[in-house]
């Protein structure tokens, strides 16, 4: 399949692996790229020199294109960007911030820039900033989301109607059926997170991977909107948040409860009780942990078969 996304990134399939914190290390990114998609290293949970190590290992593991995802709220973002430049990364996805801040700088270094958005307003701002493509993420997605709570199903056609750059759909996509639906809605490609988190190549703890398999519809919820909206599993930590909400908490009280390293505790260390378990709604269709290569093949084969059936 050839389209604007495969041509932009020089990849075989218009499938991008989300750059998830504590999940998307060099092993996952290189495996996705080797299988024909675009792998992303998630820099949001890495110190600059740790990111450098992951980039160098990824280069050794694949000769295919790969990228780095950088949340712009990261406190050492200048240092991360310096590492990205020094290591010759050619694709950068940015999120959680103003795309104007880094887009021109990166593009002047001949880097392809993609920004993650959650609304038409932010999509237009990203296009104006000069990004090469946008990821439109519906609030079905695990982890941090936009406050608008727009679903992928509604967001993609609304954005596609307004912008003239490639659109990548994210949130609630985990198989060929979801990919086909997103592209019928107007997406040029898809970004997939939770499905790739449940792989042997993912950096996540085995407890977290098993939780992805156990999650059913209704087991996750978007919360902490006063801080940074996040979709997580309804575990003990989530229940503590809800109990605090009953007392009309201040932002500071919510921050105190959140504390530090909650995501690391849940995703990387496997604490299913007190950790922040960032998992998307699509987990309800993920039933086993299988290698990245098999997932890509399954998604592409199902996509092609369903497309033929759909066209009949």
What are these regions (language model features)?
Residues 146-168, 174-312:
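Conserved active-site-proximal phosphate/metal-binding subdomains
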Residues 20, 172-173:
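Active-site metal-binding loops of divalent metal-dependent hydrolases
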Residues 116, 171-172:
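Conserved acidic functional residues
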Residues 1-162, 166:
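Active-site entrance/lid segments in N-terminal catalytic domains of soluble metabolic enzymes
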């Amino acid at each position: 399949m050839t389209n604007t996304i495969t041509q932009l990134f020089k990849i075989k399939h218009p499938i991008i692996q989300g750059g998830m914190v504590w999940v998307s290390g060099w092993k996952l990114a290189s495996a996705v790229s080797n299988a024909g998609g675009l792998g992303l290293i998630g820099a949001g949970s890495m110190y600059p020199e740790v990111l450098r190590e992951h980039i160098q290992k990824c280069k050794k593991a694949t000769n295919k294109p790969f990228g780095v995802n950088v949340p712009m709220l990261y406190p050492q973002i200048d240092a991360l960007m310096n590492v990205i430049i020094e290591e010759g990364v050619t694709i950068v996805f940015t999120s959680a911030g103003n795309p104007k801040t880094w887009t021109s700088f990166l593009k002047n270094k001949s880097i392809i820039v993609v920004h993650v958005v959650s609304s038409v307003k932010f999509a237009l701002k990203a296009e104006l900033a000069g990004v090469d493509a946008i990821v439109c993420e519906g609030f079905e997605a695990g982890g941090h989301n936009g406050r608008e709570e727009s679903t992928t199903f509604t967001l993609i056609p609304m954005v596609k109607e307004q912008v003239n750059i490639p659109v990548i759909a994210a949130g609630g996509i985990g198989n060929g059926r979801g990919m086909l639906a997103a592209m019928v809605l107007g997406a040029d490609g898809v970004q997939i997170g939770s499905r790739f988190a449940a792989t042997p190549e993912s950096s996540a703890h085995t407890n977290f991977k098993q939780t992805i398999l156990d999650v059913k519809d209704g087991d996750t919820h978007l919360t902490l909107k006063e801080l940074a909206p996040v979709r997580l599993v309804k575990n003990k930590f989530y229940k503590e948040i809800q109990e605090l909400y009953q007392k009309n908490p201040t932002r500071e009280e919510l921050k105190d409860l959140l504390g530090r390293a909650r995501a690391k505790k849940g995703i990387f260390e496997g604490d299913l009780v007190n950790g922040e378990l960032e998992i998307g709604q699509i987990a309800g269709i993920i039933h086993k942990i299988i290698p990245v290569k098999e997932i890509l093949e399954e998604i592409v084969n199902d996509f092609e078969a369903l497309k033929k059936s759909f066209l009949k």
